[in-house]
């Protein structure tokens, strides 16, 4: 079960990183989804950091479970 969550988290993390625009202008349809560019970037940054943390925690938990 944790393996599936870890896999989904990894895929979502890749997607979140790929939709970041390096020039901080956001992605094309963000005005339709969010109220402003700044709001979209903040939400995307929070989601990305959450996924990074979740991925790291799951990686540690899965590696500990494999030892025993």
UniProtKB/Swiss-Prot annotation:
Q: Name one Pfam family in it.
A: SecG
Molecular function GO labels: protein-transporting ATPase activity
Where does this chain mainly localize? plastid
Role according to the record:
Involved in protein export. Participates in an early event of protein translocation across the chloroplast thylakoid membrane (Potential).
Q: Record the organism.
A: Guillardia theta
For this UniProt record, the keywords arranged alphabetically read as follows:
Chloroplast, Membrane, Plastid, Protein transport, Thylakoid, Translocation, Transmembrane, Transmembrane helix, Transport
Q: What name does UniProt use for this protein?
A: Probable protein-export membrane protein secG
Family statement: Belongs to the SecG family.
Q: Which GO terms describe its biological process?
A: protein secretion
Q: Which residues cross the membrane?
A: 1-21, 44-64
Q: Which InterPro entries match?
A: SecG (IPR004692)
**How does this chain sit within the bilayer?**
Multi-pass membrane protein
Tell me the compartments it is located in. Plastid, Chloroplast thylakoid membrane
**Cellular component terms (Gene Ontology):** chloroplast thylakoid membrane
């Amino acid at each position: 079960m944790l393996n599936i969550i870890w896999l989904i988290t990894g895929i979502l993390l890749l997607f979140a990183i790929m939709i970041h625009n390096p020039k901080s202008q956001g992605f094309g349809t963000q005005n339709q989804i969010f109220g402003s560019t700044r709001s979209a970037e903040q939400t995307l940054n929070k989601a990305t950091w959450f996924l990074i943390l979740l991925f790291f925690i799951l990686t540690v938990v899965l590696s500990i479970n494999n030892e025993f």
